[in-house]
């Protein structure tokens, strides 16, 4: 994989970009495999970003932390019961890992996939802000990601039922009000999208 990634080195250098590992939960893969990729990219001075939901043992983060430039870290629902209802697991491990990564000095982009019927409300946004402040977490950016159903057409092709038909993105004005909540709380690097 690293040899394949190196073929695009010219694009990384010209754009100032790098490699983002995402899709599924990258951190759930073999730590040795991720570490091998991360070390090789670091050696070649190519930036590495990891997209994660944070639901893995912290020792996996600890192993790759020296080789990762940025973490795109999903924070979906602050209420543990709602998180379990919609995501299937409690959010304690996810939030604990976020605190540990922040304490370790990691560069973090908080990403909040925002669904009107689930977490697209003032209470969840205020709870998120409170958590960040309480733990001294200062993300490089906060991205509020409006819900979309772009991948819904793939489900029937895979013989699966798409269950997100009753879900919607908050209205533009609501999204803008959430951005303002974060900005007013000192997170001036908050934006819609990312």
Language model region names:
Residues 1:
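Aromatic/basic-lined ligand-recognition segments
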Residues 6-156:
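Conserved AdoMet/S-adenosylmethionine-binding subsite of the radical SAM
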Residues 156-165:
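Short glycine/proline- and charge-enriched loop/turn segments
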Residues 164-174:
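Short, flexible active-site recognition loops that position polar ligands and cofactors
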Residues 172-194:
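A cross-taxonomic marker for long C-terminal extensions/tails that follow the last structured domain
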């Amino acid at each position: 994989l690293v040899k394949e990634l190196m073929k695009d080195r010219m694009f990384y250098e010209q754009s100032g970009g790098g490699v983002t590992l995402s899709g599924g939960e990258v951190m759930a893969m073999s730590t040795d495999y991720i570490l091998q990729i991360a070390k090789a990219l670091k050696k070649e001075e190519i930036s590495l970003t990891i997209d994660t939901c944070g639901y893995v043992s912290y020792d996996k983060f600890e192993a790759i932390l020296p080789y990762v430039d940025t973490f795109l870290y999903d924070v979906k629902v602050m209420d543990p019961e709602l998180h379990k209802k919609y995501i299937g697991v409690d959010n304690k491990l996810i939030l604990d890992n976020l605190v540990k990564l922040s304490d370790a000095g990691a560069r973090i982009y908080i990403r909040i996939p925002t669904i009107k019927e689930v977490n697209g409300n003032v209470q969840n946004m205020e709870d998120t802000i409170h958590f960040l402040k309480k733990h001294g977490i200062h993300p490089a950016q906060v991205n509020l990601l409006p819900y979309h159903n772009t991948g819904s057409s793939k489900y029937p092709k895979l013989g699966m039922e798409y269950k997100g038909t009753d879900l919607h993105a908050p209205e533009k004005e609501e999204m803008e009000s959430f951005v303002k909540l974060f900005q007013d709380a000192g997170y001036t690097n908050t934006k819609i999208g990312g």
